Amino acid sequence: MQENNMMNQVSEEEQLIEQAKIRREKLAKLVSEGKNPYEQVKYPVDADSETIKNNFEAYEGKTVALAGRMMSRRIMGKASFSHIADRTGSIQIYVTRQDIGEENYASYKKDYDIGDIFGFKGFVFKTQTGEISIHVTELTLLSKSLLPLPEKYNGLQDKDMKYRLRHLDLIMNKDVRDTFRKRSMILKEIRAYLDGRGYLEVDTPTLLTMEIGADARPFKTHHNALDLDMYMRVETELCLKRLIVGGMDKVYEVGRIFRNEGMDAYHNPEFTTIEMYEAYTDYIGMMDMIEDMYKTVTLKVCGTLDINYQGTEIHMGNWTRLTMAEAVKKYAGVDYNDWATDEDARAAAKSLGVELEHENATKGWVLIELFDAFVEDKLIQPTVIYD
């Protein structure tokens, strides 16, 4: 079985090498014919696939110019159909020998490949099956793809490859591209929200001369010019608080954090945080603002407060606030206020089958461990845990 898998892997690699060789030969042929795609430095674009599809009545019959990557092709003699993916989605194009010329159509059929990038002009119409398409009158090869795209039209299937070859994942998966765009929109709206409330966005140091901040191991480097060991920051908190001390009443930072620790589905050594601090308010005031910010940003980015995340409906308009003790009482059935001593707390944990990390854990630590064991995975809807 293992031998067969190895043979299949070698066969796939040989096929990829052969396909890459063929594509380079096609490129050489195009260059020899004076059609070098890499000499095309720009292509004017005046529309995109999503706008055309969403406003067909306004675009029907009009000439538009688009650019994108060819994701499929159906050749039918003197006419063909392709799907072109641009930054907003995908649209079908209709290409004929009569419209783009015999020589260019011959190249389209024989020398152009799935994955190549084109610029094209044509008029918008609907096919007999009702699909919004573009009848191409001008087709220009802008870039030749020298490596074949993954076999699966619906995207990469190998999770490791998805993360190692993000550019391929973006090419093949529209949902991934949408996630990138939505992340950008979220950050934009968060900034707009905070800026509109008088917050000042700041950049605090990424390289520090000492290990400070959260209980996390930092990445260490060396500054050659100063002959000084330095550390990548593990949080932005302390520097932001110094700005509050310095008289800046409202500050926030969207910052990259680096922690030289383990990795799993919830932890990455490099990630982004948003921290904000405000003078002359309390944690209730910050809770109020954060809840309002989430609702405002969600409505602007998603158009609704009810969103679906991995098959689960999240209702951003309904927030719950619980103290940690209230949450443990609700989900574990034990009341923190009934524990007169640390021994009472440890006995409660034992009765629930929770093995404590520290045998002499105090009431507070027992409460935290019960929260981890019984509460955290049940908090699906927006919930603030405090006190």
Task: Identify what each model region corresponds to.
Residues 2-12, 16, 27-33, 37-285, ...:
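Class II aminoacyl-tRNA synthetase-like tRNA-binding/catalytic domains
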Residues 212-218, 299-387:
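Metal-assisted phosphate- and nucleotidyl-transfer catalytic regions
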